[in-house]
């Protein structure tokens, strides 16, 4: 049975949700409902679908594209920041749902991909609800689960062994399959 849902890409899912809300209300744009009502309906619909999946026990992963944004610094210099290619309103909804808000990338050609989970420089927009998550991990599911469990354990130690979540996730073990046995099953 499946244990997670991967939304690839979140930008397209958000656009479809906006279109659905507009069609349901006979409008062209979410702003047409006035006083933020369209965005409220968008947030409610998005939360209902994806929080509903998490309440059913599924992990939900959102995949999106990056956007490079040049910002002016107070000293007159410019900095290029990396952020999700989402509208600010959509980004706010997604960030509010996310326990981990990371940035997957390669540091150099030929190297393993990494997942940046924290960035003190402010260049990469990312973050996490768990304060002991590492800045970066080699990107794979097992590393993510192990880092998350370690962060939860460290936080629990600070809080008289009270966990910040209801249950621990077991890191998956590598499964190997026998081709002939699988073919016999079919």
Pin down the residues of each PLM region.
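Walker B beta-strand of ABC/ABC-like P-loop ATPase nucleotide-binding domains
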Residues: 5-6
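P-loop NTPase motor core
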Residues: 9-90
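Charged/polar, solvent-exposed surface patches and flexible loops
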Residues: 15, 19, 41-44, 48, ...
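Generic hydrophobic, helix-prone segments enriched in Leu/Val/Ile
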Residues: 17-18, 84, 90, 94, ...
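Noncatalytic linker/hinge segments flanking ATPase motor cores
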Residues: 45-55, 100-108, 141-147, 156-159
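Phosphate-binding/switch region of NTP-binding enzymes
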Residues: 60-136
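Interfaces that engage single-stranded nucleic acids at replication/repair/recombination sites
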Residues: 123-186
């Amino acid at each position: 049975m499946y244990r997670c849902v991967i939304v690839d890409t979140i930008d397209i899912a958000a656009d479809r949700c906006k279109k659905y809300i507009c069609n349901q209300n006979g409008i062209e744009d979410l702003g047409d409902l006035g006083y933020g009502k369209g965005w409220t309906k968008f947030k409610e619909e998005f939360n209902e679908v994806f929080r509903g999946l998490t309440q059913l026990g599924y992990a939900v992963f959102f995949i999106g594209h990056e956007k490079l944004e040049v910002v002016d610094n107070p000293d007159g210099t410019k900095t290029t920041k990396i952020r999700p290619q989402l509208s600010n309103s959509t980004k706010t909804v997604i960030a509010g749902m996310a326990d981990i808000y990371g940035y997957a990338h390669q540091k150099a050609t030929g190297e393993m991909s990494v997942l940046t989970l924290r960035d003190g420089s402010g260049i990469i927009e990312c973050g996490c609800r768990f304060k002991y998550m590492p800045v970066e991990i080699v990107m794979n599911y097992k590393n993510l689960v192990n880092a998350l469990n370690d962060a939860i354990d460290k936080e629990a130690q600070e809080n008289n062994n009270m966990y910040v979540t209801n249950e621990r996730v077991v890191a998956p073990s590598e499964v190997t399959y026998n081709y002939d046995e699988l073919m016999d099953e079919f």
